[in-house]
């Protein structure tokens, strides 16, 4: 914009006739100074002068509220807090990146790229440890912003994004497209993170563990005033959707980033184009060396093929572009003291040793505990309580003990002894031959496994108790209304009104759903029991093979291995489960409570025309539930797999079928649409 004299903006007389013009001039000036400060790093007025301009605009907007424009800098902080975040479907999927963890990984990626498109140069930039954000501008004005979410659907965080001062509410200049989507990373600089935790510490509030969590939590505040106080920052790293698509854009990724900067969007000052592979490695090493000195947390660098035409030729796989990769930094390591070991019991009964550590800051977070995995890992490390240990954050996420420092072992160091009995229920802890993990044999009886076991029992693919969500299960157990799956069927509507936010109508509906769930199938019942490594398909195969629960309960490991897709390990799990008295008591209680299923007739060869065939489902089915389609195909003898291969007999492609359809066509696999599937199922009903 052409500069307007500061004195003029501060002193011009304002009347109802010229108020709109003056307010627009003030907004335009303040937005330009924001860009000069946050993007160009070249402020042209002092902070006090900026504040005087802002105060004048605020006073005028108070006098003439009907003249407030959408891109006014005063509109960065919204009014009332939101009740919830709306969902936004991305105009173009926001994909994640594949990772390289060493030179061999990156070299393999480089070879894949050059084999397809020849020599390339890379646009390299730090991999910010924040939250991916999509920002949509229409006619240059910020219209909406969303999180990445699952890549297809994110959450509407428009009001919160507006509070980030480095993000322009209106783009600079006039050479931008009519509609442009900007993608980038919202993050919390280290200094802002430290200040945030200092304030929390002074108020005796819970501290954030790292800047990434702080940034994510700040962007997901329903009240944008809280976000505004968190001092978030943003760097743009890519263009998304551009309309019209004929709008002239730069031909390289680096030049497109410069276009974004010219429109007033901040980009990292560490971006560099590397024409040679040696330059890429030098860039990686340079950023790694300077990592701790940067103003923000990073966990690697991102390498993108610079030429846009080459990017388009390389294309995408299901979840990531073929032309970019995140080259991750090695995990950071620190030394600390092993003060003790606790043993935790998970849903499947796994007894896991957890190291209690003297707190140490490593990889951007304070670590006070780490998993020791199992007895084999303890033996491999030769670790004892009292040892000095080396902690690494693998992939900068999971803390783990990688070694001990033998020369620092005190005379008082003690062995780590695995418990013979479950620390929760007292049942025997057993370790099956060939397994590294020790497990509580209490199954559904063990209190530690109870919540997760009952959540699984009631879940959609198990007994499918409509309305029995995780929070309801947790309340039922916490209030001691339920101690085993069979107790679910003793619940009454009046009992369930004791739960939070559960009125009589909801309780009556849930009671009806519980009653309806008594009628199930043997396959669903077996899956609901939560037997280790027995998923839907295995449960269905067991039900079809044995036809009755009584036959399955007494089956030997040898008999179990005769079942399709059941190997020796799964057979051991099943036999072991039915050998535990506590588990049999729970099953008998469920039968006594009225859980039942229709008798299974052994299928004839004529009833299984798809026996021996492998089918795959992909895309959206409009007339048939995906699980129902899978079950009906299995009933006809088909094996339903999750991926397409040369062994696939048929792919059922619903709407928006993606990479699986392309692969099936490439391999010459038969493809069937939903109508053809329905016709097949109807013909064999």
Swiss-Prot record:
Binding site for Zn(2+): 422, 425, 440, 446
SUPFAM superfamilies: BRCT domain, DNA ligase/mRNA capping enzyme, catalytic domain, Nucleic acid-binding proteins, RuvA domain 2-like
EC main group: ligase
UniProt xrefs under InterPro entries: BRCT_dom (IPR001357), BRCT_dom_sf (IPR036420), DisA/LigA_HHH (IPR041663), DNA_ligase (IPR001679), DNA_ligase_AS (IPR018239), DNA_ligase_CS (IPR033136), DNAligase_adenylation (IPR013839), DNAligase_N (IPR013840)
Domain of life of the source: Bacteria
Domain BRCT intervals: 605-685
GO annotation, cellular component aspect: cytosol
EC number annotated for this UniProt entry: 6.5.1.2
The keyword Iron belongs to this UniProt entry's keyword annotation: no
Binding locations of NAD(+): 47-51, 96-97, 125, 148, 185, 304, 328
Pfam families: BRCT, DNA_ligase_aden, DNA_ligase_OB, DNA_ligase_ZBD, HHH_2
Family to which the UniProt record says this protein belongs: Belongs to the NAD-dependent DNA ligase family. LigA subfamily.
Protein name per Swiss-Prot or TrEMBL: DNA ligase
Source organism per UniProt: Shewanella baltica (strain OS195)
